[in-house]
Structures are given as structure tokens and as C-alpha cells.
Curated annotation (Swiss-Prot):
<keyword id="KW-0573">Peptidoglycan synthesis</keyword>
<keyword id="KW-0133">Cell shape</keyword>
<dbReference type="InterPro" id="IPR036615">
    <property type="entry name" value="Mur_ligase_C_dom_sf"/>
</dbReference>
<keyword id="KW-0547">Nucleotide-binding</keyword>
<protein>
    <recommendedName>
        <fullName>UDP-N-acetylmuramoylalanine--D-glutamate ligase</fullName>
        <ecNumber>6.3.2.9</ecNumber>
    </recommendedName>
</protein>
<dbReference type="InterPro" id="IPR004101">
    <property type="entry name" value="Mur_ligase_C"/>
</dbReference>
<dbReference type="Pfam" id="PF21799">
    <property type="entry name" value="MurD-like_N"/>
</dbReference>
<comment type="pathway">
    <text>Cell wall biogenesis; peptidoglycan biosynthesis.</text>
</comment>
<keyword id="KW-0132">Cell division</keyword>
<keyword id="KW-0963">Cytoplasm</keyword>
<dbReference type="GO" id="GO:0071555">
    <property type="term" value="P:cell wall organization"/>
</dbReference>
<keyword id="KW-0961">Cell wall biogenesis/degradation</keyword>
<dbReference type="Pfam" id="PF08245">
    <property type="entry name" value="Mur_ligase_M"/>
</dbReference>
<dbReference type="InterPro" id="IPR013221">
    <property type="entry name" value="Mur_ligase_cen"/>
</dbReference>
<dbReference type="GO" id="GO:0008764">
    <property type="term" value="F:UDP-N-acetylmuramoylalanine-D-glutamate ligase activity"/>
</dbReference>
<comment type="similarity">
    <text>Belongs to the MurCDEF family.</text>
</comment>
<dbReference type="InterPro" id="IPR005762">
    <property type="entry name" value="MurD"/>
</dbReference>
Length: 458
């Protein structure tokens, strides 16, 4: 049973509240808390000069600022602390604050707890954004007032008073957001699981544990959607508290969705033929099947079919940019893990020129090398992980006694220039980094946009 938002309003009024992080996603939260009568202090590692005009904007509405390298040293004396998702709650500063009586939470935890609308939550290692968007589009097509947020869209907590019980909310949730959750969405999905974010999580087991929070607090009338083709997620059926639907690309599924004789079906009913889908790759068929399971109770087959046959993809996800001198360029900047890059490679019918590399999340690249060596014509590497990826591929190339040209570059501009010089008519060049962007770019969108800008200047 969800709590009425008036309880939160009564709770937060006049409280001393710390908001850690003054990033774009936290700014609406800060302003909303001020509007609700909280005494807000915003904390950030950046100095005033780097924050720019937002520092003055916040001070004008009565927000105190704590800035600079040692900003977390001043967390004492607050009633409530909203932490940014990527910060571990076992940091000494948070532990000390909690021991002193502070309530530590996050925007997403409070949103799910008080949101009056039905909440669809999507997590997993790969396919989250596409599946979130598919669910959103299907619900919208059916006529529901639908909101989308979490890792995509806009921060939703500040809009919670506009939401009603007959509205729908679709959230993409990361392991960081889920780590401290003690509340779960009514309809939850885990797309798949493979090692990821091991630069933040202690190990893969903790990463999986965090993902499970998406269904751990469900009730008996809630729904969990699981990938039958993924051993880890398939076994989670035993831990489910409510109903379970599964999806599969390789097995017949009667209680869920599957691909059968090239037809996408849900609960035995045909939705569409795979040849009529705009999205490239079998991984996107899996994303569609997962979405069908999530919306099955709320959306007609006609609405599912419309979205499945008309949706052409999300920006930065195997996105076709242009063809230059017979060479096709694709932007798959969202691919921040080896498994996501491998899925992208599998969507092409011939080996490609791959541009990869970036920030090191401490995850292995051997699975990418072993599964992708025969799908890559030339490998162009950049970023912090370039030598790590090179080493993984060289081992496989040596073991398989095959050949592959590997080129090391120092920038995106150089990567595209090298690819353009090497490519022959009929080739495909794709940016699919298998890594996060933080060594060179603030996020994958900026990385993808730079790649597109360079390609469009060719």
C-alpha cells in the first residue's frame, strides 16, 4: 500500500535537509524541497566557478551551499540526506551521519514510495533504455497519461503532485538507484545480467543483489518479468513474491512472451512477424518480448503491434547516422558494457570496423573478444581501456590462429579519421565502446553526439 504524499510533506517541512550533488537531475529536487518548506543545503565537489549560474540561482531561493573537495566532511547535523545514486551508502561520512540520527534516502526511493500512479520498473545489464521506451510508447499508444523517468527522461519527484492513480509511470532503474531501495515497483523487469559497474560495486554478487531490490519488496498482486534465456534471471522466479511472466528467444513460453516461427507472441497470441520490426538485432526482439509481458494486462495487441512495427529505436543505440562513399556509420554510444557491444555486433550481417574503449568499470573484456572476434573486421581502440581490450583480443586471436588489425588512437577525431581511411565501399563503421564515457566525456550522449558531428563533417 502506497503512502499518501501529504505524509511526506508533513515530514519534510522545516527539516534540515542536505542534498548531495548539484547535477542537472538534482536541481528540480532541491527547488521542490524548498517549495515544500525544507531548510535545504546543497553539497557538491565542484567549486562555485565550475557550477556557474546555478549557484546564484539556488542561493536566491534560500539554499545554502557547501562546495569543494572536502564537501562531505560537513554532513553533520542534518535531519534528512538525499544522496546521489552512484555514492555508496557505506561511505564513512554517510555512516557517521546515520549514526547521528540522519534519515538517508534518494529521490527515486521517495518517488516510488509516494507515487499514486502505477509504476513499471525496468533494470538489467543491457536493454534497459530501449525496453523502458517501448513500454512507455505502448502505454501511451493505448491512451494512458504516461510519465517516463529514472535514468532517462526528466526527474519526476518534483511532478509527483500532478500524477493521478490512473496514470502510468515507467522508470529505468540502475543498480546504483536500487542498492538502497526498500520499496519495489508494482510491475518489475530484469532484462538480463552480466558483470557491470564493478568500479562501484564490491563484486558481481553485490551487483546482482542490488538488482533484486526491484522485486524484493513487491506484494502478492504485483508482477515480475524475467528473461528465461538468462540463467541468473530465470532462477529468480523462486524468490518472486507475486506473479511471474517470462520471455524467451529460444524456447516456447506459454506464460509470457516468445519468438515462435519468426512470430512474436504473448500468452500464445501473435503480435507481429519479426520481419516487420524496424529495430535491428535479436536483442531488440528480446526487448520487445519483455515489454509485451510488462504491459500485457493494460495494453491491447493492436497497440503492442503498432509500437513493435513503427518504433525505430532510441538515439545512440545502433543508430544509423549516414552513408559516405558507400560506407555506413552507426552510433551505439549507449553500449557501455562488453555484452551490450556484443549484442550490437550481432545485429549486423557482416564483420564491422569497430571503434571501442573508454572508462574502466573493472569488468572483463574476454567475453567480448571470444564472442566478437569473428564479427570485427578492424578494431580501433581509444580511452583508458584501450590496452586492456587489445590484450583480451590478442589472446583470442593467438588462440584461434586468426588475424585482426588493431589500431590504437588517442581521440574520437583520430578514431573516425583512421576508420574513414581504412574503410572500403560496403563496410560498416560503428562506435560501440563497451565502456562508460567518463574518461573523456561527461556521459554517453555527449560521446555519441561528438561521434555523429565528426561523421557528419566527412
Amino acid at each position: 500500500m502506497k503512502s499518501n504524499f501529504s505524509k511526506f510533506k508533513d515530514f519534510i517541512k522545516y527539516k534540515k535537509v542536505a542534498v548531495v550533488g548539484i547535477g542537472v537531475s538534482n536541481r528540480p529536487l532541491i527547488k521542490f524541497l524548498v517549495k515544500l518548506g525544507a531548510k535545504v543545503t546543497a553539497f557538491d565537489k565542484k567549486h562555485r566557478e565550475k557550477l556557474g549560474s546555478i549557484s546564484l540561482e539556488l542561493e536566491e531561493i534560500g539554499v545554502d551551499l557547501v562546495l569543494g573537495e572536502n564537501y562531505l566532511d560537513k554532513l553533520d547535523g542534518y535531519d534528512v540526506i538525499f544522496k546521489t545514486p552512484s555514492m555508496r551508502i557505506d561511505r564513512p561520512e554517510f555512516v557517521k551521519a546515520k549514526e547521528s540520527g540522519a534519515y538517508i534516502t534518494s529521490e527515486m526511493e521517495e518517488f516510488i514510495k509516494y507515487c499514486p500512479a502505477k509504476v513499471f520498473g525496468i533494470t538489467g545489464s543491457d536493454g534497459k533504455t530501449t525496453t523502458t521506451t517501448l513500454v512507455y510508447e505502448m502505454l501511451k499508444k493505448e491512451g494512458y497519461r504516461t510519465w517516463v523517468g529514472g535514468n532517462i527522461g526528466t526527474p519526476l519527484f518534483a511532478n509527483i503532485e500532478e500524477m493521478k492513480e490512473d496514470h502510468m509511470v515507467v522508470l529505468e532503474l540502475s543498480s546504483f538507484q536500487l542498492m538502497t531501495m526498500d520499496v519495489s515497483p508494482e510491475i518489475s523487469l530484469i532484462t538480463n545480467l552480466s558483470p557491470n559497474h564493478l568500479d562501484v560495486h564490491k563484486d558481481f554478487e553485490e551487483y546482482v543483489w542490488a538488482k533484486k531490490n526491484i522485486f524484493k519488496y513487491q506484494s502478492s498482486n504485483n508482477l515480475l518479468v524475467l528473461n528465461k534465456d538468462d540463467d541468473l534471471t530465470n532462477e529468480m522466479e523462486n524468490e518472486a513474491l507475486g506473479d511471474v511472466l517470462k520471455f524467451s528467444l529460444v524456447e516456447k513460453v506459454y506464460n509470457g512472451a516468445c519468438l515462435s516461427n519468426n512470430k512474436l507472441t504473448i500468452q500464445g497470441k501473435e503480435v507481429c512477424d519479426s520481419k516487420d520490426i524496424n529495430l535491428k538485432g535479436r536483442h531488440n526482439i528480446a526487448n520487445l518480448l519483455a515489454a509485451f509481458c510488462m504491459v500485457n494486462k493494460y495494453v491491447s495487441i493492436d497497440s503492442m503491434k503498432y509500437v513493435a512495427t513503427n518504433f525505430s529505436g532510441v538515439e545512440h543505440r545502433c543508430e544509423f547516422i549516414r552513408e559516405v562513399n558507400g560506407v555506413k556509420y552507426y552510433n551505439d554510444s549507449i553500449a557501455s558494457s562488453p555484452s551490450r557491444t556484443l549484442a550490437g555486433l550481432n545485429s549486423f550481417e557482416k564483420p564491422v570496423i569497430l571503434i571501442a574503449g573508454g572508462y574502466d568499470k573493472k569488468i572483463p573484456f574476454e567475453p567480448l573478444a571470444e564472442g566478437g572476434y569473428d564479427k570485427i573486421k578492424i578494431l580501433i581502440l581509444m580511452g583508458d581501456t584501450k590496452n586492456k581490450i587489445k590484450s583480451a583480443f590478442e589472446k583470442v586471436i593467438s588462440h584461434k590462429k586468426c588475424e585482426m588489425e588493431i589500431v590504437i588512437v588517442n581521440s574520437m577525431e583520430e578514431a573516425v579519421k583512421v576508420a574513414d581511411n581504412i574503410a572500403e565501399k560496403g563496410d560498416i563503421i560503428t562506435l560501440s565502446p563497451a565502456c562508460a564515457s567518463f574518461d573523456m566525456y561527461p556521459n554517453f550522449e555527449i560521446r555519441g553526439n561528438e561521434f555523429k558531428n565528426i561523421v557528419n563533417r566527412l
